[in-house]
Curated annotation (Swiss-Prot):
Native source organism of the sequence: Arabidopsis thaliana
GO biological process: translation
GO CC field: cytosolic ribosome; cytosolic small ribosomal subunit; plasma membrane
Keywords, in A-Z order: Hydroxylation, Ribonucleoprotein, Ribosomal protein
Family matches, as Pfam families: Ribosom_S12_S23
PROSITE patterns: RIBOSOMAL_S12
Matching NCBIfam families: uS12_E_A (TIGR00982)
UniProt gene name: RPS23B
Protein name according to UniProt: Small ribosomal subunit protein uS12y
Length: 142
């Protein structure tokens, strides 16, 4: 059972091609419109307000408490958990601080041994978290 051949087969071939496109992951992702239902709603970064600092236990076989922050996004009010990278960087973040959040690198999936965390903190109060960590800049007084 191959594909349809012949002079009048164009419509059928076109229809089959359109139907088979939905088997392609990238096509489905770009055409279903689910990107707008996600917390970032199609953008790469988002600003949010820190609600609380939390520790999330690492998955087996690792044993650690990964430092994260519960953040409410300004654009749509959704609450997400965001990982705070580097040793001691959680000390630079206070509750009610404005933070910039980015994706965590696996296209919407959790990374490594941190369950359910798909985002990371990039900036705190408009200052890069890396600059604060390396003591190149100070957090502005509010």
């Amino acid at each position: 059972m191959g594909k349809t051949r012949g002079m009048g087969a164009g419509r059928k071939l076109k229809r089959l091609r359109i139907n088979q496109r939905w088997a392609d992951k990238q096509y489905k992702k770009s055409h279903l419109g689910n990107e707008w239902k996600k917390p970032f709603a199609g953008s790469s970064h988002a600003k949010g307000i820190v609600l609380e600092k939390i520790g999330i236990e690492a998955k087996q076989p690792n044993s650690a408490i990964r430092k994260c922050a519960r953040v409410q996004l300004i654009k749509n009010g959704k609450k997400i958990a965001a990982f705070v990278p580097n040793d001691g960087c959680l000390n630079y973040i206070e509750e009610n601080d404005e933070v910039l959040i980015a994706g965590f690198g696996r296209k919407g999936h959790a990374v490594g041994d941190i369950p359910g965390v798909r985002f990371k903190v990039v900036k705190v109060s408009g200052v890069s978290l890396l600059a604060l960590f390396k003591e190149k800049k100070e957090k502005p007084r509010s």
